[in-house]
Amino acid sequence: MAQAFFGGVHPNDMKAATNEKAIEQLAAPAEVVIPMSMHIGAPCKPIVAVGDKVTIGQKIGEPGGFVSAPIHASVSGTVKAVEPRPFSMGGTMMSVVIENDFQNTVCPDIHPVADPDSLTPEQLVEIVKNAGIVGQGGATFPTHVKISSGLGKVDYVIINAAECEPYITGDHRTMLERPEQVIKGATLLAKCFGVEHVYIGIEANKQNAADVLNKTIAELKAPVVVEVLHTRYPQGAEKQLCQAISGRQVPSGKLPADAGCCIFNLNTTCSIYKAVYTGMPVVSKVVTVSGSGVIEPKNLECPIGTPITKLFDACGGLKEETYKLIMGGPMMGLAQYNLDVTVGKGTGAMLAFAGDEEQYEEHPQCIRCGKCVGVCPMRLEPVFMYKYLMKGDVDTWQNTLHGMDCIECGACAYTCPARQPLTHAFRMGKQKVNNARMAAKAKAEAEKAAAEKKEA
């Protein structure tokens, strides 16, 4: 078994409701609302207008910068609106609203690669870019940027199939039902990076998936190795996965690529397979719909832009006593206040919690037990990080306590007996640091422009 990482927690995985349920195809809704930002980086610019006819897989959003990814129509039909709509990250986001014509017309430009084995790394990067593929484990970093920046620098390519968040089972079902997509996608990455093997990291509680993948690897004679990992949260975090499989620790302030590792989510790998072998860009997402507030939990494959209310409807609806909705897992997901938000490329789960779920009340008084320090997988000191942030000392939080190294896994908040909002506070701290950096950059650019104007 692979190495264990420091810290971590063992929450009840709560996967029994869906881990034996096959993925169901959700019928496309009458209307999809596709946000122009489903990735880290610059939002896309809409390239369609009201009244335009669109087809499945047609590009409707042009990347707004280098770190960006195009967006495609998930249904065929007519553009009904291009306007701000409620967004899962909060507030609103410019979105393209498409009225479904239910003809399922596919864009004529979509076609598979004639000879996948002959693809050069540069050609694969271009295919991935045009397909709008991003990290689908939640981070949503554009995959073509990750590949191109890692070429010639990494010797470990790892597929993240840990799926360590409670409730979520979409990756597990994908491995059981679509193992060829996983292995062929991994093989494309092996050839692209020029590595002898690609490693797939799977937690020990999914041994049946590991067995299915190993059988497929043998049948395809693929350069892929399955590594069974300890069942511990957050085993699927990039830096912890890098350490578990390669034995290398990512330095403070650095990325896995700086330790010679490049890590891809399992569904991202399947999207690479689809882009090459079918030509289809990212137009759908497997989503686990679960939680005590869901009448009939399921794993659903949904068109991008499907309103989350349609997912719950397909699962028999919500219980009356439901009090909270979360997009993503319970540890790192985001609470939602609006049923009009829609499925995006990084949506792995929609959870609903009813009145019978255990609820806690946050208490402001830290008892200095140190549990948060013992479970932090980054070896940080959340007890002090929180206190300095509450005092407004962001400088000490950032530079002395290395607050920017926090991976926001939520292990500290999970174990805190005082129920202090530690993870939320650290996210706010990061936002303050990033805002200060952006302000400093804008000031420097303005001063430079003023100096150049004066010289002219």
Regions found by a protein language model. Name each.
Residues A81, P86-F141, L151, Q207, ...:
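Acidic low-complexity segments
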